[in-house]
């Protein structure tokens, strides 16, 4: 029996209006996931209802865990640094501060909530980005 690999941290950022799309994205990730990997799903948010959180927790399985990270306090601490515009929501900025908010995590994947996953994220996570701070896909 193969031993499962370390957890792969995957981050989403959304609000209560967008969490349903996050759930579709997560389901597509689960549909293509390696059974040998463990995926730790972090949902960065300021206002996801308990009802929607329960629905997303119900998606957990042996390979996927979900945690909701309420980032309102952190957001208030950096708000003066953020140029807010009509076309940028606060959740747009969460991805920029993942490394600062989670210093215990050395490497992670961020995915937009409206992305459909067509391959296994374990392969993407295994890719060596060297000393680069960010790696990106199209």
Predicted regions and their residues:
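A structural signal for isolated positions on well-ordered beta-strands in alpha/beta enzyme cores
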Residues: 9-11, 40-42, 67-69, 109
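GT-A fold catalytic core of metal-dependent nucleotide-sugar glycosyltransferases
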Residues: 72, 76, 91-138
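Active-site catalytic pocket residues across diverse enzymes, especially alpha/beta-hydrolases
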Residues: 33, 60, 128
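Short, surface-exposed connector motifs at secondary-structure boundaries
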Residues: 35-40, 105-107
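Active-site-proximal specificity loops/subdomain of glycosyltransferases
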Residues: 51-101
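Short internal beta-strands
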Residues: 39-47, 136
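A short acidic (Asp/Glu
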Residues: 21-23, 51-55, 121
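N-proximal low-complexity "stem/linker" segments adjacent to membrane-targeting elements
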Residues: 1-27, 31
